[in-house]
């Protein structure tokens, strides 16, 4: 042991102690144990190579020895795992068979190598005896005293565990001294416990009654939940505008291929304690499962690949080689491919025909729908025009009756067209229900003089036409207001309703 002192830049001294010889411990080199085993392995490999007249370098020999050690360690490790899985302390013949099958080895090849090694052993007897002497020297002495010490250690460990965790078995005192004690209770913690069958009839009946009550409660809860769901689903929804048209169009395009979903029993409301409906529901479910199973079985019988695989790989089928199985599968695959290529043009032609028919049906349905809409619109316009004509005739008759009393008021009245249809509505609400019409452009192209001449009543004079204000087109609401001139005097005996002035075709938008 040596000690050194050194001074650092800050002025402090540090002492370094170095141990060269261990005073109380004895150092054992690993070469004393590993080197003889490695040397014996090298000599065995060289012994096998010498019998085959093969020369090898030292580097190649080291690599070959490493490869042999890795392979042997893997085999021994796998054998150890197999014995542990089978809960054995030593490897059995079945474990060795599994190991050989895992490494793709068979007994005849091993026996052939054994005969070759026996021949080499007899030919090179002197070298073999030297190798055996080396292996006997490297083996550690094994005495019976060591076995007794190991057994004593196991007993001591067992006693220590029993002291820490004594077993709770009452039969512990009856065990003789030459037998081992019971293990602690934690060893039985994860062992399975088998069910104890009930043989008493009274307890069996009680359990049956209890289970029936629980099932009845479950059925009642199920009925309540289903009734709640059905009541929530039966709430009326706002009707869609084009739902019926869409359904008709789909039926016309796709024909009978469109299958409507049948309403299940779950959509109906279950009453409380109604076991009959629940039983019907269960029967329907069972039928659906049976139909699904039958469809799958039918598909399996029609599928050629599944049929071939079942006939080839079933245990009842005769044994066949892998090549024959592969050939049959390839042959069936080629047949299916040729059939597919043969039927592909037919399928494409059928697909085009179906698409063409669907397009024609869709065009017909759209045309029929358009004609229906046009007929409905024309009928609605005719009805609205007839009603409007009656209203205008009534207003003209009222104006003719009022001409005798208030001529000046009628001469100075004008029509103001409300261009902002969203802010104000007409007082009479005559034109609020009218929509746009396609005849508006045709009417606007006609001369204004003809329109004015057609709309004038027989009692109106030329002075009345000069007092009318210009009319704004494309309006939806008309606000009829009267503007009196300073020369006109109001008439107290006039009717309370607003007078109807001159209405031209430009004023009315259909």
Swiss-Prot record:
Additional note from the record: Present with 4684 (+/-522) molecules/cell in log phase SD medium.
Keywords on record: Coiled coil, Nucleus, Phosphoprotein, Transcription, Transcription regulation
Keyword Metal-binding recorded: no
Quaternary organization: In TFIID, TAF8 heterodimerizes with TAF10. The 1.2 MDa TFIID complex is composed of TATA binding protein (TBP) and the 14 TBP-associated factors. One copy of each TAF1, TAF2, TAF3, TAF7, TAF8, TAF11, TAF13, two copies of each TAF4, TAF5, TAF6, TAF9, TAF10, TAF12, and three copies of TAF14.
GO biological process, one term: transcription by RNA polymerase II
A cellular component term, taken from the record's GO annotations: nucleus
Region entry Disordered, spans: 361-382, 459-510
InterPro entries named among the record's database cross-references: TAF8, TFIID_su8_C
Protein name as it appears in the record: Transcription initiation factor TFIID subunit 8
Summary of the function given for this chain in its UniProt record: Functions as a component of the DNA-binding general transcription factor complex TFIID. Binding of TFIID to a promoter (with or without TATA element) is the initial step in pre-initiation complex (PIC) formation. TFIID plays a key role in the regulation of gene expression by RNA polymerase II through different activities such as transcription activator interaction, core promoter recognition and selectivity, TFIIA and TFIIB interaction, chromatin modification (histone acetylation by TAF1), facilitation of DNA opening and initiation of transcription.
Bias-annotated ranges (Polar residues): 478-495
Subcellular location, principal: nucleus
Biased composition (Low complexity): 465-477
Phosphoserine: residues bearing it: 269
Organism, as annotated: Saccharomyces cerevisiae (strain ATCC 204508 / S288c) (Baker's yeast)
Top-level lineage group: Eukaryota
Domain Histone-fold: 37-103
Spans through the membrane: none
Localization (cell): Nucleus
Family affiliation: Belongs to the TAF8 family.
Coiled-coil intervals: 142-165, 346-383
């Amino acid at each position: 042991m040596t000690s050194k002192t050194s001074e650092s830049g800050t002025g402090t001294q540090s002492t370094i102690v170095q141990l060269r010889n261990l005073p109380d411990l004895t150092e054992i080199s690993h070469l004393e144990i590993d080197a003889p085993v490695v040397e014996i392995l090298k000599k065995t490999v060289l012994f096998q190579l010498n019998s085959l007249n093969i020369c090898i370098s030292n580097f190649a020999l080291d690599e070959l020895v490493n490869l042999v050690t890795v392979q042997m360690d893997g085999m021994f490790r796998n054998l150890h795992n197999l014995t542990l899985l089978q809960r054995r302390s030593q490897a059995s013949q079945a474990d060795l068979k599994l190991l050989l099958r895992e490494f793709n080895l068979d007994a005849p090849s091993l026996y052939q190598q054994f005969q070759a090694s026996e021949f080499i052993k007899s030919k090179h007897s002197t070298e073999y005896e030297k190798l055996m002497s080396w292996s006997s020297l490297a083996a550690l002495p094994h005495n019976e005293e060591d076995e007794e010490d190991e057994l004593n250690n196991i007993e001591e460990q067992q006693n220590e565990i029993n002291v820490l965790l004594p077993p709770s078995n009452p039969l512990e005192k009856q065990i003789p001294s030459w037998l081992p004690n019971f293990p602690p209770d934690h060893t039985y913690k994860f062992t399975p416990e088998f069910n104890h069958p009930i043989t008493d009839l009274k307890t069996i009946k009680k359990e049956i009654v209890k289970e029936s009550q629980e099932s009845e409660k479950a059925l009642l809860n199920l009925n309540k939940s289903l009734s709640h769901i059905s009541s929530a689903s039966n709430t009326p929804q706002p009707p869609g505008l084009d739902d019926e048209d869409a359904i008709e169009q789909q039926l016309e395009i796709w024909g009978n291929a469109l299958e409507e979903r049948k309403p299940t029993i779950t959509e109906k409301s279950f009453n409380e304690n109604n076991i009959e409906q629940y039983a019907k529901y269960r029967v329907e479910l069972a039928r659906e499962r049976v139909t699904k199973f039958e469809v799958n079985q039918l598909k399996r019988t029609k599928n050629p690949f599944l049929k071939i695989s079942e006939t080839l790989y079933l245990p009842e089928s005769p044994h066949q080689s892998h090549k024959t199985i592969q050939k049959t599968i390839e042959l069936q695959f080629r047949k299916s491919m040729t059939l597919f290529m043969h039927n592909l043009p037919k399928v494409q032609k059928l697909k085009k025909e179906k698409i063409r028919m669907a397009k024609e049906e869709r065009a017909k349905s759209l045309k029929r729908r358009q004609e229906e809409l046009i007929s409905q619109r024309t009928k609605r316009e005719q009805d609205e025009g007839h009603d409007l004509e009656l209203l205008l005739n009534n207003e003209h008759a009222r104006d003719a009756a009022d001409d005798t009393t208030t001529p000046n008021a009628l001469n100075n009245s004008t029509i103001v067209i409300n261009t902002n249809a969203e802010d104000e509505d007409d007082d009479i609400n005559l034109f609020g229900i009218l929509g746009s019409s396609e005849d508006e452009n045709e009417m606007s192209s006609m001369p204004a003089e003809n329109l004015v001449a057609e709309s004038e009543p027989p009692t109106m004079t030329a002075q009345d036409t000069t007092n009318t204000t210009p009319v704004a087109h494309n309006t939806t609401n008309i606000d009829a207001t009267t503007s009196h001139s300073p020369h006109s005097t109001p008439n107290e005996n006039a009717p309370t309703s607003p007078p109807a002035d001159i209405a031209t075709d430009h004023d009315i938008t259909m």
